[in-house]
Amino acid sequence: MPKISSRDGGRPAQRTVNPIIVTRRGKIARLESGLTPQEAQIEDLVFLRKVLNRADIPYLLIRNHKNRPVLAINIELRAGLERALAAACATEPMYAKTIDEPGLSPVLVATDGLSQLVDPRVVRLYRRRIAPGGFRYGPAFGVELQFWVYEETVIRCPVENSLSRKVLPRNEITPTNVKLYGYKWPTLDGMFAPHASDVVFDIDMVFSWVDGSDPEFRARRMAQMSQYVVGEGDDAEARIRQIDELKYALRSVNMFAPWIRRIFIATDSTPPPWLAEHPKITIVRAEDHFSDRSALPTYNSHAVESQLHHIPGLSEHFLYSNDDMFFGRPLKASMFFSPGGVTRFIEAKTRIGLGANNPARSGFENAARVNRQLLFDRFGQVITRHLEHTAVPLRKSVLIEMEREFPEEFARTAASPFRSDTDISVTNSFYHYYALMTGRAVPQEKAKVLYVDTTSYAGLRLLPKLRKHRGYDFFCLNDGSFPEVPAAQRAERVVSFLERYFPIPAPWEKIAADVSRRDFAVPRTSAPSEGA
């Protein structure tokens, strides 16, 4: 099974603070300020495990085709389970949503049982939670209960699961145990072994970041820039301005991509004051991963991106992102990689356009044209589209191969202190189309992406709807080079939005460093062991 375990591999500590229960719109809920959606789901799973054990009700832990945790129970024990849950949830905002029949509203388990149906076969249980900013943990983050019919020779399941069909011959079933979340669970042999459709390899993430508010950095940058001619918008304040977007970009990883193994922050700035030391976070200085240190210092993101594959300890498969790019909802590793490691990139509708590179264009537009010419010379195919502003998947071995094949272009870009009209843009399109043309990348056509120019009033008007519906896998809150909105007003609106969209402090924030909390989400390097 891909990327699920406790962070420390042991039994998670119990929370010491009694939950606050509130009523909102006629429904009760916990006020949640510490658990991510996945952590809350696991906490509910462990809660249900204890209820079942105390009631002496046998169960199996299985996984469905979407890797949601499922507890399978003999249908003859459903009435007893309903009574046990009603008693255990007397003071809990535990709700049950019937999956058998779409459209049925969730019911409060303590008073209304498991379903409005007389004979439900699949229900989803969850403790309703409300986080700061109004983020609600609903049935999407629930634990599924399935009621199986045990006959003399077969077991009939209401739906297929990740391993088996709806009818299980009893003579083909081999019970076993699996250790997950600090506990031993009864299951079926093969259920939690790595499946061919699983992404089981390590995936790291790299962010590039600069603290543009540092007066010394700004002075050094301006002094060196005066000696160069830069393209349209490349000298803009927006290139370096930051309002703690990195904090919320990292929160988005913690909340929605807990399968990320390690996070590297490529920066020569002083670490932000909110960042605590944490084993999952590594600050990487340019001198640690630039092949040619004589090229430093650099103020060129293209240069930094051309050297990412030299970061010590970086996994073969990794994601790269800027601090203005966010995960908008829970994502699987398969959004970025196939089980065999093929990368999946997201093309934008925007065309690169006509014309060659020239000093008057922006560095972004020039690099796309340099990429296009190099790839045409190598493969005889023309790339036509930019990529979306999202985190991108990369493979270290492919980048090493590219640097060997295009040594002059990599070296020239790494040595350019500012964006130049001869730069390549490795992470924006060069890698992805090179990998596509060599059979190691494919377009990702299912992702939902939103780009917002937060320096325009039209862009700011999109934020309330974005927060309310949370319907995008990725969104970018870009700081445009030609602003319409005053900087202070933009900062207030954007930070307010981000704080409400990502209300759960990550464990590497100083505000969370001393808080006792469950610690579930750092992935294993392999699937959990069966029979443990």
From Swiss-Prot:
GO molecular function: transferase activity, transferring phosphorus-containing groups
GO cellular component: peptidoglycan-based cell wall
EC number: 2.7.-.-
GO biological process: polysaccharide biosynthetic process
Domain of life: Bacteria
Pfam families for this protein: Stealth_CR1, Stealth_CR2, Stealth_CR3, Stealth_CR4
Segments forming a coiled coil: none
InterPro entries: Stealth, Stealth_CR1, Stealth_CR2, Stealth_CR3, Stealth_CR4
Alphabetical keyword list: Exopolysaccharide synthesis, Transferase
Protein family: Belongs to the stealth family.
PANTHER family: N-ACETYLGLUCOSAMINE-1-PHOSPHOTRANSFERASE SUBUNITS ALPHA_BETA (PTHR24045:SF0), PTHR24045
Miscellaneous comment text of the record: Stealth proteins are part of a protein family that is conserved from bacteria to higher eukaryotes. Family members were first identified in microbes as proteins that help pathogens to elude the host innate immune system. Microbial stealth proteins are involved in the biosynthesis of exopolysaccharides. Stealth proteins are predicted to function as hexose-1-phosphoryltransferases.
Name recorded for this polypeptide: Exopolysaccharide phosphotransferase CpsY
Species: Mycobacterium tuberculosis (strain ATCC 25618 / H37Rv)
Gene responsible for this protein: cpsY
